[in-house]
Amino acid sequence: PTSQIVGTQATLNVLTGDEIGHVDCSPAPDQDEPLLALGAIHYHGQPVFLVIADSHLNARKAARLGRITYDEAPPILSIEEALAANSRFEEGPRIWSRGDVASALARAPRVIQGRLEMGGQEHFYLEGQAALAQPGEAGDMHVTSSTQHPTEIQHKVAHALHVPMHAVRVETRRMGGGFGGKESQGNALAIACALAARLTGRACKMRYDRDDDMVITGKRHDFRIDYKVGVDEAGRVLAIDFTHYTRAGWSADLTLPVADRAMLHADNAYWLPNVRIESHRLRTNMCSATAYRGFGGPQGMLGVERVMDHIAHALGLDPLAVRKANFYRKSTPPKTGAGTAKRFGGAHSPAAPANEGPQTTPYGQPVEDFILHELVARLEASSDYAARRKAVDAWNAANPVLKKGLALTPVKFGISFTLTHLNQAGALVHVYQDGSIHLNHGGTEMGQGLNQKVAQVAASVFGVGLEAVRITPTDTAKVPNTSATAASSGSDLNGMAVKAACETIRDRIALHLAEKHQTVPASVTFANGRVRVGGRDLSFAEAATAAYQGRVSLSSTGFYATPKLAWDRLKGHGRPFFYFAYGAAVAEVVIDTLTGENRILRTDILHDAGNSLNPALDIGQVEGGFVQGAGWLTTEELVWDAKGRLRTHAPSTYKIPACGDRPRVFNGALWTGENPEDTIHKSKAVGEPPFMHGISVLMALSDAVAACGDGSLYPDLQAPATAERILMAVRRQRGQA
């Protein structure tokens, strides 16, 4: 009874779903996720009541006094149980196709089929979910939130309080990590704090302890992918049929766009002339799966990479040769740095003439800038792939206990939100009369270096040093209607918006100085903290002062909307992405066939960041993304028991990669070349694409397991490839299962 809780010392109030009604905190349009349970409990860990007390400790003590009576019902937990119960989102599976798959499969010289299961992943941001709400005058509410999406927090809090959005101000200074886990999962805390602050008239703060955070909040979607592929004797794909099964949890959250993006990346880097992709989005009694770095892309990409490995094994070919044989053709010379294409092109290009035009993805987007032929050739050379392939084979022939594996996998990742209207950003820039610059933009900083890159953009426009630029916390009262800092879009969108605002102010200053010194604006230059005009040399501060005294506005907003996008998700056709980011990774591993334990010995990565805004930051993202991706596919295992209780909800039971899990030799480099599209300084997004380099580790582990047998049985290693799964796969290879 709530009366027992309210009667405790320092407890101010207790709220239940019956009292507050359906207060929605879901990012989905269906509004199917109430803040507090209403009559039914849909998963173990679902919030039921809210305790308001004078301290965090007292609130937790009081909450332990609560008693809840349940009538247990059998949960739907597995993909098989959801299919049997027809428990799903949408009326049925989503199906996209091209060509005549059935006929092409029937005519194919070889048909291969299989199944791949991959687990979910906990975000494990170092700073947990947290929010602070402070009531203001006239019903206003100021919310400070650890969120990737301040505008969604603003919208949800305003809806919960029954006030317009202008009455709610949301501010985010920075986050201690996000990875997609703070795109929508912070809604509940912000709403709860705002309701408590409105009720008590006092500021209210809330944060999850690590165990609560892991039990309550969403994870990466786990998938099962069934495939049937027809190939010729050279390993070229003639037709492929994918079926994706997505375990979504109890509410929609972001499942539909995540599953869509998995379908959009089912081709990865490969031309699939006849393809069918069927996607089932299944409702289960677990915490709702949500956004996570890659947003479905890694799952879809892993499916086709498993197919390439399976083809190579079935035909007795080198997996890299099969991958290269199925690459999209190079329709035009890639717009890379001087000499790069000449040095690494040619022999590795497909036989089709370059003037045939671009091939298209299964959803109809032309692949016009495909650089993986040259990029992979360069990585083959720099990583000494061919010699190491021979060395690994020789090692495996001589060592019965420790087996090595080697794999090279490519990445082609689409950049843009698939919900087209989210591809926009705003910025606000002030230049003060002393030459200092105040900048605010709609992106959020979570350790990825967005503010550093945006400050560089502003400094380059005005020709000043970074010390002149101050970025203030992301604030819905300064830049409205922001999109989430997600989909690797932070630098692309906000960088362009900031550039537009800064150029407006710079051009005003240039016009004023040109008129004053009787010259043309084009002759006014900004560089190295100086402004040159009509033979005069001014400091930027002097130029700003002159403009101020000339009554020139030194404040401007900037806005950017990504061009060229047109996407119809119902038909599965259009151009959902502005461009593709590319890369490739080589991983070498060793496994102990007696225990299943394994190590990553060496990793070589070559990644396409376009004309990098900050190579040091981008290399950090590439290396960190690889480690996180490798963790998803090796050590990070989520385990639920038969009643739907998450058993891996603490660092003691859930293992993210540690220092000892990193490759012993780690070589990361950036591809030299500009983005052919008109992005900020011709750069490319680098947040999500490197995550998929971790796929090379699973493929290398599979290669090592295959070395334990006679080649007749495909390893069929599932993910995450824990020591237990590796050991079982080894035993199957040796006929001991």
Protein language model features and the residues they cover:
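C-terminal catalytic domains of large/alpha subunits in multi-subunit enzymes
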Residues: 9, 17-20, 162-167, 197-204, ...
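Hydrophobic "anchor" residues
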Residues: 237, 251, 437, 597-598, ...
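Conserved beta-alpha junction segments in alpha/beta enzyme cores
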Residues: 101-161, 260, 407-436, 441, ...
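Short acidic, glycine/serine/threonine-rich loops at helix termini
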Residues: 24-29, 62-65, 154-156, 179-185, ...
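Short glycine-rich loop/turn motifs
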Residues: 38, 127-132, 224, 405, ...
